[in-house]
Amino acid sequence: MTRRELFTAAGSAALLSPLMEAAPAEAVPNPRGHLGMGGAPAGFGAWNAAHASPGGGRGRGAGSRPFLEGFFDYCHSLGLGVAEAGTPPTNPDDVHRLRDKMASYDMWVIFDVGVPRDEADVERFDAGVKAAKEAGGYGLHAALTQRRYEQFNTLADYQKSFEQNQKSVALAEPILRKYQMRLALENHKGWGAVEQAAWLKRLSSEWVGVHFDFGNNVSFLEDPMFTLETLKPWIFSCHIKDMTVQPYDQGFLLSEVPLGDGFLDLKKMVDTLRAKNPNMPMDLECITREPLQIPIYTDKYWVTFGEMPPRQVAHMMEIIQKNPPKKQVPHTAGLDPAARLKEEEDNNIASIRYARAHLGL
């Protein structure tokens, strides 16, 4: 299937036709099949733009993206072995076609089924998990939060949101157990590693764990290895990425960069996770965008955190000082759609090649 056919099948050829000619994808051979590196939609901005649905998206509970069969095909065309592909299909023909593709491509799929908001929403969640099971999903992913330091103005507001997250997952757990489907909760700039670990320890369910993002908790002044080690007992799956940090007047700028271009010890992190589970899905999420502002010198940043260990803060300041960007970090402001897609694909292909050569992915 060609790149044009992929976009057409996804219903977005008219929107993206100028981009397809400007930035052709380049497949990277995948010798590991479903054990090779996968793809997360946030790292593929053209797909996010083409398939955004009103009220959907990450961090919105029940609002999840519709099934992205085109993205599943696109990941295969790039040499990726796993795809995070929205909500599961329910039409029997679509389910059979997906199962056939998973077998022929030797790929896995991870679905997003929004957790129940309340008791009245459990029936919808049950139907979604059942559909994911019937479609052959490896598991479920959920990102329940936005950026905590931007979203909330008081500690009480954050605590109310966290309580709702815990209630939703508690409602979801019996359904997950019923269908024996695992739900992996992403550390999505909402909870610190210690908070998330304590919650999962209290929940004590083999069906609820972590979708570990390699870089998100840098925004909480956490060393990525600390985050990994703290959450490791519960990690089911991952978003692999590399990060750079650089100072600005209100704190530091945080950017995803191609694998190998940042300060993360990727080999150590991958080896640690492979030792836990040699078959763990690791999905590439190199988001090509403007650097994120982490305003640690403002009162607004700290209002939801309470006390943070001084040594933790000092360690992150040392990382910022000693790890300037190795290359120009991605910037997208002012780029036309074709140039943005070209930069994104270049970054993703570079990351896939690095993962093949240096990480065994």
Task: Report residues per predicted region.
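Catalytic domains of carbohydrate-active enzymes, especially glycoside hydrolases
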Residues: P66-P89, G136
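Short, acidic/polar
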Residues: G57-Y74, D121-K130, F220-T227
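Twin-arginine (Tat) signal peptide motif
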Residues: M1-F7
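Active-site mouth loops of central-metabolism enzymes
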Residues: A40-P66, D112-V122, Q159
